[in-house]
From Swiss-Prot:
Family annotation (PANTHER family): LIPID STORAGE DROPLETS SURFACE-BINDING PROTEIN 2 (PTHR14024:SF53), PERILIPIN (PTHR14024)
Top-level taxon in the UniProt lineage: Eukaryota
InterPro entries, per database record: Perilipin
Function in brief: Essential for embryogenesis. Required for normal deposition of neutral lipids in the oocyte.
Tissue: Ubiquitous expression in early embryos. At stage 5 expression is restricted to the pole cells. At stage 11 expression is seen in the amnioserosa, refined to the fat body and midgut by stage 14. Also seen in the hindgut by the end of embryogenesis. Expression is seen in larval fat body (at protein level).
Similarity comment: family membership: Belongs to the perilipin family.
Species the sequence originates in: Drosophila melanogaster (Fruit fly)
Location of the protein in the cell: Cytoplasm; Lipid droplet
Record field: compositional bias (Low complexity): 315-329
Signal peptide: none
Gene Ontology terms: biological process: lipid droplet formation; lipid droplet organization; lipid droplet transport along microtubule; lipid storage; lipid transport; negative regulation of lipid catabolic process; positive regulation of triglyceride storage; regulation of transport
UniProt protein name: Lipid storage droplets surface-binding protein 2
Residues covered by region (Disordered): 1-28, 298-352
Major site of localization recorded for this protein: cytoplasm
Amino acid sequence: MASAEQKHATGNGTTGNGTAMNDVDQPKDAKDLLPHLESLERIIKLPVVNAAWDKSQDVYGKVKGKNRVFEWALTAAEDCVTRAVTTAAPFVTKLDRPIAYVDQTLVKGIDKLEVKAPIIKDTPQEIYNQAKSKVIDVVQPHLERVVKFKAAGQQKAASLKDLAWQKANEVLATQYGSLAVNGVDTTTALAERLLEYYFPKCESDVEEDNDDKQNAVVQNGKSSENDMPVPASEDPVLHTVQTVGRLSNKISRRVYRNVSRQIKQVQKGNINDYLSSLIAALKLHQYINFINSSMGTNVEQSGGSSSDACSPFGTTTSTTTTTTTSSTSNNKPVVALPHVAKSKRAPAVSSQ
């Protein structure tokens, strides 16, 4: 009996010990070890805080799963925090009353904040929409005022333009205005004739003009007949403007095409000939300048020795002086003989 009772007691003890061990070995979450904080729960339930919390968790999960090194480091940090909470839980439970008092105080503060600032209950999108509507309500009146001023200015400008256009048509409708319009037409026709003479149109110009007309029809929906100006009887001002503009465009296109065509036709040989002739002209100019400078130097030197008499036979100053002295002493006329070199003496002539 004793053994049976001992076995039964041992079995009961084992069962009790096993139950106690199971209670100790059951892992508890770190959240369950800490006291419940109503203030923290209400703060997390706020839309703005909740959105920020979800976003931070999303970023944390992406960073943690991006690399094994990050995953290992963050997992180790989580384990350290869990162990710290588990270690500090027995000490925190002893401070339940102060923590509860602080929690209730924070809850009351949150209630007052929700009453004074109800915007904290709204979602971020609702806050954005409200802020946008406030800004629009403030700015919209000023924008409407600016738009009104702009519309009034455009209307005044249009009315002034129409009035000026009408007055110009009235002036051109008179006799002198008609003469001026006819003069513009005559001058335009003469300019077109001169343009055709000096800058004739080639086949490429015709093709480009046709392409331009087709592009204008595609873009503006206008036919090629609208290329001609309106009659002067309908609108003299518009007729004059279109005539002058058409002539200006025609001259610019024709001159540009002819000049570009001439540039394309210039060959490398022509360029070489032009450069060689230019170099020869420069050399000739330098040679002429050199001759002129040399002649100027000779003239200056001859001007410095102008006291000596010159003759085709050489200088005769000393000979003349000697002859004059001898003739004075002998009282006989003596003729000055030219100086002759010894190697070129004249042969003696007999007196017979």
